[in-house]
Amino acid sequence: MIISASRRTDIPAYYSQWMFKRLKDEYVLVKNPMNIHQVGKINLSPDVVDGIVFWTKNPVPMLSHLSELDKYNYYFQFTLTAYDRDVEPNIPSKNNIIIPAFQKLSQTIGREKVIWRYDPIFFNDRYTMEYHCKYFKVLAEK
């Protein structure tokens, strides 16, 4: 079984303590989105979980606890774009926090386990094709 944690919210950024507790207890309760009265208990033991994919824009809360994931195969889908606070007001400073976190995560768990997502891409008067091409290259060089 592959756990996608999560496309509904940023679990590493906002709920990492909860996630580590769930992994320690080896289960999670999940409501069926089509029937909120139905709750399933999902086994999270390492012998059942083939892998965990963490989707995040900010893994900082997890960085000091990565050893708690040693029993699991896991990857990070790390979303890093060139948008400023007008688009991403809740993301910490990219230059001071997020990019160093990306680098530390890659060095700690291996760059093959950190997949960079430059997503979403949209265009307007400020965020032009030229802007995205320039800053994609700037980010890639870091």
Please identify what each model-predicted range represents:
Residues 1-88, 98, 102-111:
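Conserved Radical SAM active-site core
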Residues 63-66, 87-90, 124-132:
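A short acidic (Asp/Glu
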Residues 97-142:
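Conserved C-terminal portion of the radical SAM core fold
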